[in-house]
Regions:
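Structured beta-strand/loop patches that form or line metal/cofactor-binding pockets in enzymes
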Residues: 2-54, 58-62
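Metal- or metallocofactor-binding catalytic centers and their adjacent structured scaffolds
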Residues: 7, 46-90
Length: 90
């Protein structure tokens, strides 16, 4: 088996968050409150060459957690990531 070629540096050019909510048939009641839907936050990162990668952010509780985490990504984390160069996952 041949070794993998070295990784090329990743240079994020754009970071976006997408909040989705899926209604559930029966609300889930816990000590944190009642959930009437299941939230999800998907993250899209595009590099300076146009390659795109997707990820997600855990956001089950509290109910407003999905919007809060999406806003944190776009206002705090994205400015720290965009335009920098990353040699690898470490």
């Amino acid at each position: 088996m041949k070794p993998l070629p070295p990784l090329q540096p990743l240079r994020p050019a754009r970071v976006e968050a997408f909040v989705l909510r899926c209604p559930i048939a029966e609300p889930v009641r816990t000590s944190f409150g009642t959930m009437v839907d299941r939230p999800a936050v998907f993250v899209r990162i595009e590099d300076d060459e146009g390659a795109v990668g997707w990820g997600e952010i855990w956001c089950n509780f509290p109910a407003c957690g999905a919007e809060h985490r999406a806003r944190l990504l776009e206002t705090v984390m994205a400015p720290l990531l965009v335009g920098r160069s990353y040699a690898g996952p470490r």
